């Protein structure tokens, strides 16, 4: 092919040659001659549907199968690149239950791109849908699955370190895994078994905070190295968040982020488990007491923890039928999903202007605690409304970039340039990433109820 004049804003104009395989690829891809941005040989990039601590998320389409996918894009010049590491962790995890499938990783112009399975709404989105309280039955069905999910992650020599409702998603409506709770976003994960020595990482103190302050373990607040016990304690805090509707350490005020995180940690330590779990089954307190007493190196007894909740589940006479509290409700269809809101489409410029104004007002937002050389990024406008409810604030960006065909949201030729959101160093513990935290887009107004085999 003849050399073309260089253009700083465009990648290679050639269409990548078709390939039947997906996975890691070192060949760069970019805009085709038709102006459509491509990732790999067969993934077309569509509209922006969200952003996170990696960069931004785009809707995509596999041109070979006509299936929609999620495409994570991270600037190659990122100060703390993590997408390649996350890809390696996904490959390490393989195809376990509730683990998103990864289809491709490779360069895309000035970006690294990872193509993943597209999932449904997050537990935080569904929590909002259910008036911010889950029933005991729903929490137990979630808990039983997530203990197994975390056990699987740990079995692959990884600790997760980022427990929060926004990182647990149901499957896409109509999919056979639509009621399975998936775990996503391994940007903060870490190997706790040294791959060379095969030994557990050493115990250390004076570590910087990594994770989401609202849910992280007490030992993490104290600067102790995280291990398997901390993932399970964070899950316990999240379970109580679902049952109670909020946690005692939410909404604390302080002059600085450091003081705020200190207050959160102090309040966690000062809140007896009996008080935190008051008016709820004793098993909730038993769970937290057990995980908080674990030694740094100790392997948790996952079967014991699961049995706590399965026995309670059976004693209450519940059936594991996946009839969650949100079943029968209309699932959220966020701005930027496949189904365009006509009003939003016709008033795109007004919405973009509003989003820019909101972004300028929230530059000093205190968002989730993600030190350890990690990055954070602005989130969707809906998150701002939720953050107000919790006394927090977040940065906002528009997620409606690009004019896209309503029949095929990845077919647009006038997508706005992919730009990296403003980088900041810390984020507030409210971490209201909402619908667009990862690839949680809903493509159908109503879901089909479908009973699937019980997950352990």
Curated annotation (Swiss-Prot):
Source organism, top-level taxon: Eukaryota
Keywords, alphabetical: Acetylation, ATP-binding, Cytoplasm, Kinase, Nucleotide-binding, Phosphoprotein, Serine/threonine-protein kinase, Transferase, Wnt signaling pathway
Catalytic activity line of the entry: L-seryl-[protein] + ATP = O-phospho-L-seryl-[protein] + ADP + H(+); L-threonyl-[protein] + ATP = O-phospho-L-threonyl-[protein] + ADP + H(+)
Disulfide bonds: none
Residues with N-acetylmethionine modification: 1
Active site location: 162 (proton acceptor)
Basic and acidic residues compositional bias, start-end: 1-16, 348-370
InterPro entries: Casein_kinase-1_gamma_C, CK1_Ser-Thr_kinase, Kinase-like_dom_sf, Prot_kinase_dom, Protein_kinase_ATP_BS, Ser/Thr_kinase_AS
Post-translational modification (record): Autophosphorylated.
EC number: 2.7.11.1
GO terms (BP aspect): Wnt signaling pathway
Modified residues (Phosphoserine): 414
Region of interest (Disordered), ranges: 1-35, 342-375, 392-418
PROSITE patterns registered for this protein in UniProt: PROTEIN_KINASE_ATP (PS00107), PROTEIN_KINASE_DOM (PS50011), PROTEIN_KINASE_ST (PS00108)
Binding site for ATP: 49-57, 72
Extra facts: Triazolodiamine 1 is a commercial name for 5-amino-3-([4-(aminosulfonyl)phenyl]amino)-N-(2,6-difluorophenyl)-1H-1,2,4-triazole-1-carbothioamide.
Family: Belongs to the protein kinase superfamily. CK1 Ser/Thr protein kinase family. Casein kinase I subfamily.
Subunit and interaction comment: Monomer.
Role according to the record: Serine/threonine-protein kinase. Casein kinases are operationally defined by their preferential utilization of acidic proteins such as caseins as substrates. It can phosphorylate a large number of proteins. Participates in Wnt signaling. Regulates fast synaptic transmission mediated by glutamate.
Protein name per its UniProtKB record: Casein kinase I isoform gamma-3
Organism listed in the record: Pongo abelii
Taxonomic lineage from the root: Eukaryota, Metazoa, Chordata, Craniata, Vertebrata
């Amino acid at each position: 092919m003849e050399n073309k004049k260089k253009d700083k804003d465009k990648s290679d104009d050639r269409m990548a040659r078709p390939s039947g395989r997906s996975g890691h690829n070192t060949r760069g891809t970019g805009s085709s001659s038709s102006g459509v941005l491509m990732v790999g040989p067969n993934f077309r990039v569509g509209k922006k549907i969200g952003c996170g601590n990696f960069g931004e998320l785009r809707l995509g389409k596999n041109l070979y199968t006509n299936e929609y996918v999620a495409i994570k894009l991270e600037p190659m010049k990122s100060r703390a690149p993590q997408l390649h590491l996350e890809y390696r962790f996904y490959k390490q995890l393989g195809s376990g239950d509730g683990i998103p499938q990864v289809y491709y990783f490779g360069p895309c112009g000035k970006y690294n791109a990872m193509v993943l399975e597209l999932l449904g709404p997050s537990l935080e989105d569904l929590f909002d849908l259910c008036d911010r309280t889950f029933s005991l039955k729903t929490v137990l069905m979630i808990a039983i699955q997530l203990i197994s999910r975390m056990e699987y992650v740990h079995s692959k020599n990884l600790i997760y370190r980022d427990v929060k409702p926004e990182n647990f998603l149901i499957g896409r409506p109509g999919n056979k895994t639509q009621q399975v709770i998936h775990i996503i976003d391994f940007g903060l994960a870490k190997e706790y078994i040294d791959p060379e020595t095969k030994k557990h990482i050493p115990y250390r103190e004076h570590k910087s905070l990594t994770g989401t302050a609202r849910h992280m373990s007490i030992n993490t607040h104290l600067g102790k190295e995280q291990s398997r016990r901390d993932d399970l304690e964070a899950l316990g805090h999240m379970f109580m968040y679902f049952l109670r509707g909020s946690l005692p350490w939410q909404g604390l005020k302080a002059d600085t982020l450091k003081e705020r995180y200190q207050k959160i940690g102090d309040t966690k330590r000062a809140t007896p488990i009996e008080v935190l779990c008051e008016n709820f089954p004793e098993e909730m307190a038993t769970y937290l007491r057990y995980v908080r007493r674990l030694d740094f190196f100790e392997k948790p007894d996952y079967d014991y923890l699961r049995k706590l909740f399965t026995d309670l589940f059976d004693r209450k006479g519940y059936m594991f039928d996946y009839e969650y509290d949100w079943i029968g409700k209309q699932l959220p269809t966020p701005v930027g999903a496949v189904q365009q809101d006509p009003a939003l489409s016709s008033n795109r410029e007004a919405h973009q202007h509003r989003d820019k104004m909101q972004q300028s007002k929230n530059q000093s937002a205190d968002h989730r605690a993600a030190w350890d050389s990690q990055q954070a990024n602005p989130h969707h406008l809906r998150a701002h409304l939720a953050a107000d409810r919790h006394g927090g604030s977040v940065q906002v960006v528009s997620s409606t970039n690009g004019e896209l065909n309503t029949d095929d949201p990845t077919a647009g030729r006038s997508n706005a340039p992919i730009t990296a959101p403003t980088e900041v160093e810390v984020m507030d513990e409210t971490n209201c990433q909402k619908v667009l935290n990862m690839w949680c887009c809903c493509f159908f107004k109503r879901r089909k109820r479908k009973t699937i085999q019980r997950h352990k």
